[in-house]
UniProtKB/Swiss-Prot annotation:
Family named by the database record: Belongs to the transposase 35 family.
MF terms in GO: DNA binding; metal ion binding
One Pfam family of this chain: Cas12f1-like_TNB
InterPro entries reported for this sequence: Cas12f1-like_TNB
Keyword Ribosomal protein: no
Name of the protein: Putative transposase MJ0856.1
Annotated Zn(2+) binding sites: C36, C39, C62, C65
């Protein structure tokens, strides 16, 4: 399945859902990875240090509540909240951030 396009996969998924009587809800994923699913604030992208340079990572961080996660995970959380009104599980905002992570203001200054 790793060689098929997203459109083909969605078609396959819709057919399987129809076969088993599962309702499919499609939504617009635009901007779902920049809003904190925990408090609703705008997220900032974290940076990693590599060879004296700050490179963008996939981690998104909320300076208001301390939530952080991979940007794809953030998008999934926000889509679940949008369509169900439920948060998938409690964020672990008190866990330590990965070693070598640099916050945006540290990377730019």
């Amino acid at each position: 399945m790793h060689n098929i396009s997203a459109k083909k996969f969605l078609g396959y998924l819709k057919n399987k859902c129809l076969e088993f009587g599962v309702k499919v809800i499609e939504g617009n994923p635009a901007y779902t990875s920049i809003k904190c699913p925990n408090c609703g604030s705008r997220l900032s992208q974290l940076y990693k240090l590599a060879d004296e340079r700050a490179l963008p990572s996939r981690l998104m961080y909320c300076f208001d509540c301390g939530f952080y996660a991979d940007r794809d995970t953030v998008a999934v959380f926000n889509l679940i909240k949008r369509f169900t009104g439920l948060y998938p599980f409690s964020p672990k905002s008190n866990e330590p951030i990965a070693e070598g992570t640099v916050f945006p203001d540290e990377a730019m200054g």
